[in-house]
């Protein structure tokens, strides 16, 4: 029997989403929390089953890469897909953390009374149906389903095909555990078709989704931003900068640079461009770049001043850096590559940040209060840090729990996309018969009588 065309397949999955989303929006906090804890217990109980499914995914990835790439690349691809018991424990812990977070739905964010007696309040409500397209591991799958459930949204999830069996094994247990705790059937939808067209049809589904979140590389984000027919929550390729001021604690700043770049080089909030005040460059840069090159195998691309300084290191046996191209200053690398530039002062650093595209995360390493305050005031980013690793631009670092990525948008969500960012606000107004004036002149005896009522 021939397969259903991809468009019909996606349309069929989305058909009942709006109805189920209305049910999810009305669930009480205790029911959702109980379900999330049951889901955590089920993942822990299904550990062997999940790892067995993952082993099949790993074998499939290994076979697909055998004839196409070098052994090193094949090993890297296999390592990326393989899950361990530690990953299962992390999934379980994340589910329990989400269960323990306050329920944002129904929270009153503000309330006031008008002179005419109107009692006005703003209340948080779910967004509705949220699509998530991920190129990342099953940890992102679970975060997406858990956060959408907790915030009263229905999640339509399309994961990376290389984890297809792993996703199915995890999702089956989660679904059964959730339904046993009173969650409606169809509380989330998993798109299982591996074709890219399935993701494209989801992006183009228009009014079937209220928002969409891409989790992956620059190519995915660009495709979603260009073709989506609904609001998109994601970072728009914004860069992460770190400026080292001339007044700084050098060991502290060096540790921040290393952590920001190598703790997770592929993350959106990993360091892309390092700006160093030139007076301390000779003292600050050589030890840091030496570690990045030799210890962490980071490719360093430097401005002319930086390459001239570090060129002396190459003569003494160290791996050297390469000259930076113009495009490097505008690139979100999401990998083991770092651009380094020596600047004259804070003015030049700020001008560089403004002149090279959107900024997602910005850090200043300084002991000078005035410099710190100016930097935080003038840099336009989702987060601006003082003497803190850029990797801490995340929901858990802020005490907000897990997140479904970072957003660089100026509208709705800017920064980590956590529970609160998966809701919107509506106005709830109580009154006692207040009318908009002037009220229409009565045209009949009945109208006149109604207006005279106390």
Model-derived features with residue positions:
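N-terminal Rossmann-like NAD(P)+-binding subdomain of aldehyde/semialdehyde dehydrogenases
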Residues: 1-120, 147
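ALDH superfamily catalytic-core signature
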Residues: 4-8, 136-155, 169, 173-180, ...
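Flexible, glycine/charged-enriched surface loops at secondary-structure junctions
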Residues: 27-34, 181-188, 263-270, 297-305, ...
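Conserved small-residue-rich beta-alpha loop and adjacent elements
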Residues: 93, 97-177, 181, 230-234
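General beta-strand structural signal in soluble alpha/beta enzymes
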Residues: 107, 157, 190-192, 213-216, ...
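Solvent-exposed alpha-helices and their adjacent loops that cap or buttress functional pockets
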Residues: 111-112, 120-126, 149, 180-184, ...
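Conserved C-terminal structural/oligomerization subdomain of aldehyde/semialdehyde dehydrogenase
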Residues: 127, 322-454
């Amino acid at each position: 029997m021939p397969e259903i065309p991809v468009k019909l397949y996606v349309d069929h999955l989305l058909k009942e989403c709006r109805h189920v989303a209305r049910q999810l929006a009305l669930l009480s906090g205790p029911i959702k929390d109980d379900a999330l804890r049951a889901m955590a217990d089920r993942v822990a109980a299904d550990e062997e089953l999940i790892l067995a499914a993952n082993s099949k995914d790993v074998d499939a990835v290994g076979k697909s890469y055998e004839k196409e790439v070098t052994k090193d690349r094949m090993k890297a691809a296999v390592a990326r897909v393989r899950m361990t018991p530690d990953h299962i424990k992390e999934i379980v812990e994340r589910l329990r953390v989400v269960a323990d977070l306050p329920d944002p739905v129904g929270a009153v964010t503000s309330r006031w009374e008008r002179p005419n007696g109107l009692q006005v309040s703003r209340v948080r409500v779910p967004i509705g149906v949220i699509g998530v397209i991920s190129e990342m591991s099953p940890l992102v799958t679970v975060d997406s389903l858990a956060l959408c459930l907790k915030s009263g949204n229905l999640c339509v999830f399309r994961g990376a095909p290389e984890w297809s069996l792993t996703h199915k094994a995890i999702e089956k247990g989660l679904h059964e555990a959730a339904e046993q705790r009173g969650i409606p059937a169809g509380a989330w939808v998993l798109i299982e078709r591996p074709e890219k067209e399935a993701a494209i049809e989801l992006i183009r589904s228009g009014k079937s989704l209220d928002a969409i979140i891409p989790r992956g590389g620059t190519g995915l984000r660009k495709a979603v931003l260009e073709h989506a027919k609904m609001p998109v929550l994601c970072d728009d390729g914004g860069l992460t900068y770190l400026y080292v001021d001339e007044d700084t604690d050098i060991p502290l700043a060096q540790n921040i640079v290393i952590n920001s770049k190598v703790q997770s080089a592929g993350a959106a909030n990993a360091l892309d461009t390092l700006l160093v005040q030139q007076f301390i460059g000779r003292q600050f840069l050589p030890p840091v770049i030496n570690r990045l090159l030799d210890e962490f195998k980071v490719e360093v691309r430097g401005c002319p001043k930086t390459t001239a300084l570090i060129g002396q290191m190459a003569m003494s046996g160290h791996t050297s850096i390469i000259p930076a191209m113009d495009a490097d200053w505008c690139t979100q690398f999401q990998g083991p590559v770092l651009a380094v530039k020596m600047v004259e002062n804070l003015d030049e650093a700020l001008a560089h940040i403004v002149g090279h595209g959107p900024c997602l995360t910005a850090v200043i390493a300084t002991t000078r209060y005035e410099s710190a305050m100016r930097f935080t005031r003038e840099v336009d980013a989702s987060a601006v840090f003082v003497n803190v690793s850029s990797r801490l631009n995340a929901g858990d670092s802020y005490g907000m729990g897990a997140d479904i990525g970072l957003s660089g948008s100026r509208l709705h969500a800017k920064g980590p996309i956590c529970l609160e960012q998966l809701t919107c606000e509506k106005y709830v107004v109580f009154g006692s018969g207040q009318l908009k004036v002037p009220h229409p002149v009565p045209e009949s005896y009945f109208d006149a009588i109604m207006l005279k009522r106390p």
